[in-house]
């Protein structure tokens, strides 16, 4: 079953590369990465509304919303920054280098989240194997950009 989840994650990664490239192109047409990010996020909102109207999930209780820790609510602002970064940086770095750098940043942050168990992530220590894998990814970032 893990393989299904991995394939879905790879598909999501492909979507990230497509999104960054589309937003970078839109930035060129609109001459401003902020507008490219704005219109991309508007598309996200419309898509989310259509999905919610179609699937009609039960709403969470007010108590569940109120009791959520503050860091549960940073996904939206962080998503906006990611979209803006894609629109601004993909035309400068190229799609592969931008995504490679994003993956490097994601991996570094993920290792910290895992090691310390932040944000309810299951705690997994930083092992030599995990550190070596991360270093190989960072080497890949350099290779993708410069070779």
Where are these regions (language model features)?
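Hydrophobic core positions of alpha-helical segments in small-molecule transporters
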Residues: 39, 101-102, 129-132
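Hydrophobic transmembrane alpha-helices of multi-pass small-molecule transport proteins
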Residues: 127-145
């Amino acid at each position: 079953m893990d393989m299904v989840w991995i394939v879905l994650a790879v598909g999501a990664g492909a979507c990230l590369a497509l999104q960054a490239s589309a937003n970078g192109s839109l930035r060129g047409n609109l001459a401003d990465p902020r507008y490219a990010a704005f219109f991309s996020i508007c598309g996200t909102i419309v898509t989310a509304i259509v999905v919610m109207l179609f699937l009609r999930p039960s709403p969470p209780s007010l108590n569940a919303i109120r009791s959520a820790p503050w860091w549960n609510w940073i996904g939206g602002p962080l998503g906006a920054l990611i979209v803006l970064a894609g629109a601004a940086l993909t035309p400068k770095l190229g799609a592969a280098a931008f995504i490679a750098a994003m993956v490097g940043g994601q991996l570094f942050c993920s290792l910290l989240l895992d090691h310390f168990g932040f944000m309810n992530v299951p705690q997994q220590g930083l092992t030599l194997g995990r550190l070596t894998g991360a270093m190989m990814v960072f080497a890949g970032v350099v290779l993708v950009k410069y070779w």
